[in-house]
Amino acid sequence: MVWLYDRYVVPWLLNCVCSASPIVHQRSKIVPDAKGRVLELGMGSGLNLPFYDRAKISSLEGLEPSEPLRRMAQATAAREGLPVEITPGRAEALPYPTGVFDTVVCTFTLCSVQDPAAALAEARRVLKPDGRLLFCEHGLAPDGGVVKWQRRIEPVWKAIAGGCHLTRPVAASIAAAGFRVERCATMYLPNTPHWAGWNEWGSAAPA
C-alpha cells in the first residue's frame, strides 16, 4: 500500500501543494533569470515552465525521478510550446558532464532529496565556472517557536509529503556546498502556516 501511495497519491499531492498561489509567485521571482543552457533539478509537474524567458535560454533540461510527475511536466511543456528534455534520475548523481550548464534552477526541491549536500555538490559540478544556481526553497525558520513546531510536525509531514523536510537550512547549505551566495531574500509566505512557509530565494555562484 505504501508504494501505491507514493506512486499515485504523492505526485498529485505535491502538484497541488506546489501550485498554491504564494509558491507560484515565488517561482516567478527567480525562474525568469535563467539563461543559456539550463538544468532544472526536480522539475516536478513543470510548474516553473511558464516563467522561463525564451529570449534568454538556449536549451532547457529537467531532472525528475517520479514517472507520474515527468508525464505531467511533458504535458505542461506541450501546452506551453516549450521544448524540454526531461530525464529520470536523482539530484545526488546527475547524468551530465562537468561544467556544461549556464544555469541550474532549484525550486522547492532540496527539502525532499535524500542528500541535499550531495545534490548541491552535483549542481556545482555541472555548472560552468561563471554559471549560476537559482534557488527558491522552504526550510528551517529563524524563529525558535516556529522551529519547535517544525520539528514536531516534520516526521508526519515527511511520511505524507514524499519525504519533504521542514528543518533543512537553505542558504547555509548552499554556501557549505562550495557556492558564494550572491543574493538571498527571505520571508514567511503569506496564507501559509509558518512551519511550512519560511522561504529563501536568490542566486549563488561557484566559489
Question: Which residues make up each language-model segment?
Answer:
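Conserved alpha-helix/loop element of class I SAM-dependent methyltransferases that forms part
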Residues: V17-R37, L47-F51
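Class I SAM-dependent methyltransferase SAM/SAH-binding core
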Residues: L39-L41, S45-A93
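A short acidic, Gly/Pro-enriched loop at the edge of an enzyme's catalytic core
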Residues: E92-V104
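A short SAM/SAH-binding and catalytic strip from SAM-dependent methyltransferases
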Residues: D102-D115
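A short glycine-rich, Lys/Arg-flanked "PGG" loop and its adjoining helix->strand segment in the class I
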Residues: A117-P129
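Conserved beta-strand signature within the Rossmann-like core of class I S-adenosyl-L-methionine
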Residues: D130-H138
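Short alpha-helix
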Residues: G162-G178
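Core SAM-dependent methyltransferase catalytic element
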Residues: F179, T186-A207
